[in-house]
């Protein structure tokens, strides 16, 4: 506890009301957020002389100030606590890191509705189906829908620009409503069936299609009957692949496992009796935290996330009971205006779902621990190989990528003792250098990374440079200049490619004295270096390709007189990309907003000339 914080004087000012408290350290950073039914009683418990919990002892030792917010009820305190945890991300709270909004399938409100992937605020008009557990589940569902229902998935600009059916029509994935190839009635029938399918009404869809097939056969329209038959076959094939429960309805099933500091919550999303999808969460857990606290924190943060657009089902099954289970159900009721039951003691089919979720959570934790142990072992071998006197906590690696000097990008990837730390990855677009000058590119990237070294975030213990002695010298010079007034500077090591660029033949070079050395091809230390080098290369080349494509799209149209930024953007958006602009006819170009007949002819001639 800070010398300036007097706990006894502070406690005299605290009431016994419900509320939320925020604990600050000497740097005025929030280190813990908590809630209490009785603030005075709860806060007093932190300052007892016989504290046994190691985590609580460490927390109390850092307290310099405490702010208190009184609420009307304990439920209000629960919701405010969750909001504060999300806002401040305190060090001593369990933090749910994966907080992306859930994706949906959107069926647009259009004359010819479109099926599309949607994530974010629901601003567009139409029907939303979901939420889905992840983006992969949405893309898989859209791919499946295309095979069964010939509904367009192109954007509206592309739809408006068509004068002939696209490839999706040729392969039977779209009925080409853009060129009136299907009647409005038939298209709307398919939209209605797709909507029922997305709501889980598979049997109703099948019955409707069987009736249509029989009617078409009676009318001797055998071609149409065959199309309905193919749809029915595809639907039944999908139904056979899905595990269906006719008694379970909608529910979330959560398996929780916690071991050696790694926690996993595996969620099964059961909708209309089917396993709709699954997702694993790995919250950040402070040292010496117990499973009960981890479980409580996860449940509250997951289900009281005000930014999430997911609708909580009426039933939640969880593998372990936790404190304030009833309070969470009440808070969900208050926040979402729906009654929810949370259960951990279930039988029959529900118990089978729980066992499945728990098995997945346990396997996920074991896999992570095995990976962490492998990475940890490689770190130890690296420390031994390069003879450092301290533990390596953070490593960074830089790489440069370009094509003949075009669209130069530098990457900086970060590894810690658990593996890649992707949240800290950075890319630098290199500007103002002679094209192809890798030395200048490296100098600019390293300079920007450590431009304000005191505010540069975590300083790496080891800085790898993917390149030879020349790039290493440049990087070492920049680091020496940036860290001249500081005690601790990173150790630089160059990773020069071996003969024929074969893995295992790399030469490693110390930046400080330029001594070179090699490691055995089967060395775990070398494998770790290769891993961070390859990851840096992947991250750099991905960024370079994206930048190059964007530049080429723009520069090709920039050369055409009269085509400014607005017209370039309209052309690319309306027609779907540069290749589509190049292949478009004058008639198609005229349909783009802001493009006259004369301008369309100019663009057509310039791109075909």
Curated annotation (Swiss-Prot):
Highest taxon above the source species: Bacteria
Gene3D superfamilies for the chain: 5' to 3' exonuclease, C-terminal subdomain (1.10.150.20), GIY-YIG endonuclease (3.40.1440.10), UVR domain (4.10.860.10), UvrC, RNAse H endonuclease domain (3.30.420.340)
Cellular localisation: Cytoplasm
Keyword annotations: Cytoplasm, DNA damage, DNA excision, DNA repair, Excision nuclease, SOS response
Domain UVR: 203-238
Coarse class of the protein's main subcellular location: cytoplasm
InterPro entries: GIY-YIG_endonuc, GIY-YIG_endonuc_sf, GIY-YIG_UvrC_Cho, Hlx-hairpin-Hlx_DNA-bd_motif, RuvA_2-like, UVR_dom, UVR_dom_sf, UvrABC_protein_C
Disulfide bonds: none
Name of one Pfam family that matches: UVR
GO cellular component, one term: cytoplasm
One BP term from GO: SOS response
GO molecular function terms noted in the UniProt entry: DNA binding; excinuclease ABC activity
Residue ranges constituting the GIY-YIG domain according to the UniProt record: 16-94
Function: The UvrABC repair system catalyzes the recognition and processing of DNA lesions. UvrC both incises the 5' and 3' sides of the lesion. The N-terminal half is responsible for the 3' incision and the C-terminal half is responsible for the 5' incision.
Quaternary structure annotation from Swiss-Prot or TrEMBL: Interacts with UvrB in an incision complex.
Family per record: Belongs to the UvrC family.
Designated name of the protein: UvrABC system protein C
Chain's gene name: uvrC
